[in-house]
Amino acid sequence: MFKQYQFRNYRLKLVILVYLLTTIGILVIGSAEKSFQSQQILGLVLGSAAMLVLSLTDYNILMHLYWPIYGGILLLLILVLTPLGKEVNGAQRWIDLKVITLQPSELAKIMLTLFFAKFLSDRQDRINDIFTVIVSAVLFGIPAFLILKEPDLSTTITIALVFCSMIFVTGF
């Protein structure tokens, strides 16, 4: 599950810049509203833990789980539209987990990119087959529709552009 870690390959400059910008952001938010500062610090701690785990994880393992990942994303997107979803300013885009608030459409951007990379690469030899085109369009359309129902037009457009780019690169 975890790959052999080599510190010399780690982009330390990038990590330092991210922490520097995050610290500046926390200080600016803290000067405007103290109550938000603790939430931002919690986000920094949780984000750092996630960064460490993800940087040590071999992403090829995720590629073997691409169907469960797709199903999980659909489940989260459906949960947003149920009473578990939290509405803010007329948009129901979040799931309130009490400790943090999760926005599944943001996670969907990354996971759908991984899903379609694996899905399309597995079908390289029949990429121009009409059945492959229809299945790909349906698999894209379901989460896109759910995200559009939240409503989150910018995320829908983003994943549509990524999907169209992937389709173009594969040679449809």
Spans of model-derived segments:
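N-terminal membrane topogenic signal
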Residues: 1-18
